[in-house]
Amino acid sequence: MASLPDYDPMRPAEAPADHRFNRAVQGVYELGSTFKIFTSAMALDSGRVTMRDGVDTTDPIRVGRFTISDFHPQSRWLSVPEIFMYSSNIGTARLAMAVGTEGQQKFLNNLGLTQRLSVELPEAANPIVPKTWRDVSTMTISYGHGIAVTPMHLTSAVSAMVNGGVWNAPTILAANSPDNTHKLPSHRVISEQTSAQVRQLMRLVVEHGTGGRADADGYLVGGKTGTAEKAVNGRYAERSLISSFVAAFPMNDPKYVVLATLDEPKGTKDTYGYATGGWVAAPVVSQVIAEMAPILGLPRVNADDPKVRRALDIRFDGPVIENEPEPTPLRGTRLASY
């Protein structure tokens, strides 16, 4: 866990307040499309959505004075894996509404995303959640706007998505530490089958989607980009971004989750002026994994191993393969009015 800029712990009084601020557990941020991991898992685990289902993303969704649109519009029906791979806000919002507001609240509560974490750090912050959770809140929260959490909230929740479906309260104490005397909360949040599907989706983003720059040769990285405009003086500022990439590896049997979040990054010549998660945060994750995996003694994984491919390839039960048949329209009619 790191928060930059940092300071000399032997001389804290000399450090500016900004340097003493622990962004990993004290800062709360709208973490954008990283939340699509939770929405996809929630929809799949509910039984109301399958990997084969499709959603109409042809037009933006208008709710009152709000318009939900896509950064890279495909303007067609998308399957669930395509919604995730193309990071469609429209498709994700419709998946959330298929489950409903009450279902979303319960799901995020179970992941610890709506309350302060019990981690052993006194500065750990409370998330910011809507006072009134309306349908428009359900839709925007589905893609990580309208809710602000700490980076530790996000990493602990993503761990549950990829580890087989069990949420474990985060701790900074080693399991065998004499100081670790209390039993940490732990409970199942999704099925093992849904967790396996989430691993497929996250690997898909790195292989074919917006997260290609996060890959690290031999370590089967999977993940999700997240780019959110910051709220400044009560309005979202288009040029002030929180850019993130959250990853797990190796995706055939995840051992670690890594999150990199940059506060107001600037585009460069190398990023063609872009400052989004896929351009600025994903390469950080790639470098961290490439350097830490050998230190941790993790063996490299052969991505072409048939067993690995069977675990991570998306077929029909899931799409995104060229020349496959069109996805089945999402069951139910409630979404048509949004």
Predicted regions located by residue number:
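Beta-lactam-recognizing serine transpeptidase/beta-lactamase-like catalytic domain environment
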Residues: 1-33, 38-265, 277, 281, ...
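Short, gly/Ser/Thr-rich active-site loops of penicillin-recognizing serine hydrolases
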Residues: 178-186, 276-337
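Active-site loop architecture of trypsin-fold serine endopeptidases
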Residues: 268
